[in-house]
Amino acid sequence: MKRLLTMLLMAATIGCLEASAATTDVQDEKEGQYSLKNGNLTMLIDAAHGGKILSFKYDDKEVLSQLRWPESFGSTFWTSPQKEWYWPPVPEYDKKAYTVEKDGDVLKMTSEVNDKLKFRMRKEFKTDAQDQSIVITYYLINESDETRQVAPWEITRVQNEGGLIFFEAPADSIWPARLMNFKDAYQAAWFATDEAGENRKVNADGTGWLAYCNNGLLLVKRFADLEASQPAPGEAEIQVYLNRGKTYIELESQGAYTTLQPKEELSWTVRWYLVPCDGAAEPSEALLKKAKSLVNR
C-alpha cells in the first residue's frame, strides 16, 4: 500500500512539474504591452496599438525590425485578399487597441469590428516548452449577417542588413519572375537580401514554413501547407516584400481562403522558432537541416 501511495505521489509530482513547464510566462509591461517568455525566448506584444508583436528576442538579440516609421516594424496580422481594403492597413486590426484576457496559460487579444469588412480578429499567444516555440493562433470572426470569404495573413518585418531568406519551392516557380534573385540549392529556394531603388514583392507555393537567417539568429515560422488552389485570389502561401533601399523586409504567410457564414470563425496557427545560427548567412545543407529540424519537432 505504501509503495502504491509513493508511486501515485510521484506521478502527481511529475504531472505538476510538466504542467508548470508548459505554463506561459506572461508579464504585464508598460502602457498596454505584454511579454511572453519561453526559455531563451521573449516576445513583446502591444495590445494598445493593433496587437502588434514589437519584439522577438533570443536572450538579448533582436530579430524583428525596430524602425519607428509607420508600417516598418514588428509583426502584424491582416485580412486577405488585400484588394478588398488596399491601403492603408485597416485601423481596427492594425492600429487601434485590442481588449486583453488572460485565460490560464493563453494570452488573448481581441479587436474591434471594421465597419466595411465586418470581421473581428482575435490573437491567442502561448508557449510550448516542449519544442521551445511561441504559438500564435489567429481567429477571424464574421460579425456580419452575410456569407463572407477571407484568408488569414501574417506580416513579419525584419531589417534588410545582409540576411538570408529560404523555404522549400523551386526558384523558377516564384512569381513575378526575376524580381528577386532566388537560387536553387539543397532542394530549397534561397535569397541573399539585397537593395534596390524600388519596392519588390514575390509569391511562392511553399511547404508550410519560412526561414530567415541573419546576425547569428535563425527565425523559422511554421504554418499550414496550402494546395496551390487554396490561397485568396491573387495571393500566395508565402510572400516576401523588400522595401526600397536598405530598410526592411516583410516575411509573409497566408492561410486558406475560407467561406464564413454569419458569426462563423476560422482559426490559423503559426509557430515561431528562434535559435542561434552559427557561421555566415549563406546557403548550406547544415542550415537547411537546422531549419527543418525545428519544423519537424
Where are these predicted regions, by residue range?
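Positively charged n-region of N-terminal signal peptides that target proteins for export
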Residues: 1-4
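Bacterial N-terminal signal peptides
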Residues: 7-16
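Boundary at the C-terminal end of the N-terminal hydrophobic targeting segment
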Residues: 19-21
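Extended, loop-rich substrate-binding clefts of extracytoplasmic carbohydrate-active enzymes
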Residues: 23-28, 37, 81-131, 147-150, ...
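Acidic-aromatic substrate-binding/catalytic surfaces of carbohydrate-active enzymes
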Residues: 33-94
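A contiguous, surface-exposed recognition patch within enzymatic or periplasmic domains that forms
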Residues: 34, 41-43, 51-54, 62, ...
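Short Pro-Gly-centered flexible turn/kink motifs
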Residues: 100, 259-276
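Terminal connector regions
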Residues: 273-297
